[in-house]
């Protein structure tokens, strides 16, 4: 899908990715998980973002993704924060959390059933959550901010290299994505 930059363009760094300014810049991804998803389903989904840098501060409202309040559902990843706590939502309204050491890397949320979801940071699995799925949220995914009922919010300064959404991935598949990107970044000297 296409990336449509907002009127207040985020910064793009070659071989790194996009970052917002924390107040007004963000990306609109021309991808609505409720209508464009060939493989993403209510109880079979993964959503991942690779963060090159984390935003400053510990604001819990930072976001990337989409929130549809009428459906009570989010497909949303908070960027890593100094509190070493990753938070996100995958077709649900209750938070899924994973504590970890560090503040950058691949953050992936996966749902494999109506009450089975988990977060991974890089290749480390978090506790499996029993948060129940409610709906696949409708609205384009935003990065460097979140789409909250069609409006940007939760702006942040974290730098994002890539994002993916689709069918639920296994732990091994997520580890393969991480290893491939890590090898690429090492090969180009980053």
Question: Where do the language-model regions lie?
Answer:
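Polar, enzyme-active/binding microenvironments
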Residues: 1-190
